[in-house]
Each structure stands twice: as structure tokens, then as C-alpha cells.
């Protein structure tokens, strides 16, 4: 083996060794950045799995290169504003089977346009801000939540109109119209425009106000009549108590008779 071949062999060995060393550092770095209670792997991009980890909130130390994030089957109750804003490569987000009740207006800021799958099924979501899902391109799963069907939900689902599955699986737990409770949202929306309903609340308030005024007027009239009757009775008793001015039989007439 000549010197050139020996040099090439040693150079190749050094390159392979350096490459292995760099890969080890990267793997160690990724592992060290993995949130507590989660498992991280690099299969098809960084996969962060935090399922069944007894998490009460979304970790704030998620690696920025996360592509798939599984936070299902925990005890998370809310999704704060901009919690995912640094995860620009995020494609899949699973938050199913938690106790989520609140989703802030800008919860998905930074990932709304890159997400491909969003799973919020099997939570406790009753309503969300009308802008919570703005620009969301993901296929969203929001079934098995106690949704309150009203104008806001109608606006939210209309903003996600490209995803028919999203609205199709929404069942109204409660509704501004009692007859829609327990029915699929699409059926309720076909029956009535939830953003253009008669203002029954105003009518009820007006009726209550009118009834209150009517009651006050009747009460005043009854009081006034009774008070007048009492005053009349007292006046009559007073008159009866005065001495009688009857003429005595032996008193001469005041008028003299002219003979």
C-alpha cells in the first residue's frame, strides 16, 4: 500500500469517526431536550410522545424541531396563547382524552398553517373564541365534547368549512334553542341560523319590566283606595260623635209673628 492509499484510508476513517461523533452529540442533544415524562425519537422527524404522562399542562420546553407531538390521555385543562408558537415544523398534534375546557384565542398561533392533523376529541370543550381556529388548515377532530351550539360555534365551524368532517361529528350538548340539544350541529344549523335568532332575552326582559310596573301601579291603586276608605270611615265616625243640635220644645221661634 503506497502512502497515498494509506492517507486516503486514514482520512476516510477519520471522517467516519467524526460523523459518528456528531450523530452521537445530536442524539444526546435531542434526548436532553426531551420534556420530562416524554419519549423522543427521530423516526420521520422528531417525534415527541407524552401520552399517559399525568401532565396537568402543556410542557413549555418542547424541542423546536418537533414534527409529531402526542399529548393525549393526560389531565390538561387548557391551551394557553402561543404555547406552540416556536414549533414551526409541527405537523401532528394530538390532545385527545384530556380535560380541556378552555382554548385561548391565539392558542394555535404559529402552527395553524402548518398543522396537518389536530385531535381535540374526548375533552370538555363547550365553546371556543370565534378566532381560535383562524387560518387552521389541519384536519381537526373535535367530536365527543359537550358543545354549546350558538352563533360563536357556527362562526368557528364556518371558518373551518373546508373540513366537513369537523362539523359533521359535532353534537350539541346544549343549544340556544332547546330543541337542538342532543342533535348534530349540522341539523341544527340547517333548521335555523344561530346568528340570526329573535332576541328572546330582550322580550323576556321587557315582559318582566312591564309586569313589574303593572304590579306597582295595581299596588298603588289598591293602597290609595284603601287609604281613602279608611279616611272616609274615620270622618264618618267623627261626624257621628258630634252632639246633636235638636230644638227644644220650649224654645220660642226665632221668627216673630207679625199681627
Curated annotation (Swiss-Prot):
SMART domains the UniProt entry points to: LRR_TYP (SM00369), LRRNT (SM00013)
Record membrane topology: Single-pass membrane protein
Sites carrying sugar chains: 47, 94
Protein's UniProt keywords contain Kinase: no
LRR repeats mapped onto the chain: 65-86, 89-110, 114-135
Record field: transmembrane: 205-225
Cell compartments where the protein resides: Membrane
GO cellular component labels: extracellular matrix; extracellular space; membrane
LRRCT domain segment(s): 145-197
Domain LRRNT stretches: 34-64
Keywords: Glycoprotein, Leucine-rich repeat, Membrane, Repeat, Signal, Transmembrane, Transmembrane helix
Signal peptide boundaries: 1-33
Keyword Transmembrane attributed: yes
InterPro entries, sorted: Leu-rich_rpt, Leu-rich_rpt_typical-subtyp, LRR_dom_sf, LRRNT
PANTHER family reported for this sequence: IG(IMMUNOGLOBULIN) AND LRR(LEUCINE RICH REPEAT) DOMAINS (PTHR24366), LEUCINE RICH REPEAT CONTAINING 53 (PTHR24366:SF96)
Family to which the UniProt record says this protein belongs: Belongs to the LRRC3 family.
Protein name: Leucine-rich repeat-containing protein 3B
Amino acid at each position: 500500500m503506497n502512502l497515498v492509499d494509506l492517507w486516503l484510508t486514514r482520512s476516510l476513517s477519520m471522517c467516519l469517526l467524526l460523523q459518528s461523533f456528531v450523530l452521537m452529540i445530536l442524539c444526546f442533544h435531542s434526548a436532553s431536550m426531551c420534556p420530562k415524562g416524554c419519549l423522543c425519537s427521530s423516526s420521520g422527524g422528531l417525534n415527541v410522545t407524552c401520552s399517559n404522562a399525568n401532565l396537568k399542562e402543556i410542557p413549555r420546553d418542547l424541542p423546536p424541531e418537533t414534527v409529531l407531538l402526542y399529548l393525549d390521555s393526560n389531565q390538561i385543562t387548557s391551551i394557553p396563547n402561543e404555547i406552540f408558537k416556536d414549533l414551526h415544523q409541527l405537523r401532528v398534534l394530538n390532545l385527545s382524552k384530556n380535560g380541556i375546557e378552555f382554548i385561548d384565542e391565539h392558542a394555535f398561533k404559529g402552527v395553524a398553517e402548518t398543522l396537518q392533523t389536530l385531535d381535540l376529541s374526548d375533552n370538555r370543550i363547550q365553546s371556543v373564541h370565534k378566532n381560535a381556529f383562524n387560518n387552521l388548515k389541519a384536519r381537526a377532530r373535535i367530536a365527543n365534547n359537550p358543545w354549546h351550539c350558538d352563533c360563536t360555534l357556527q362562526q368557528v365551524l364556518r371558518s373551518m368549512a373546508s373540513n366537513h368532517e369537523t362539523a359533521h361529528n359535532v353534537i350539541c350538548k346544549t343549544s340556544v334553542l332547546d330543541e337542538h340539544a342532543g342533535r348534530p350541529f349540522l341539523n341544527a344549523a340547517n333548521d335555523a341560523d344561530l346568528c340570526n335568532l329573535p332576541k328572546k332575552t330582550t322580550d323576556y326582559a321587557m315582559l318582566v319590566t312591564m309586569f313589574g310596573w303593572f304590579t306597582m301601579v295595581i299596588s298603588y291603586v289598591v293602597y290609595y283606595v284603601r287609604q281613602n276608605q279608611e279616611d272616609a270611615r274615620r270622618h264618618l265616625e267623627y261626624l257621628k260623635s258630634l252632639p246633636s243640635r235638636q230644638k227644644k220644645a220650649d224654645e220660642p221661634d226665632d221668627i216673630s209673628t207679625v199681627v
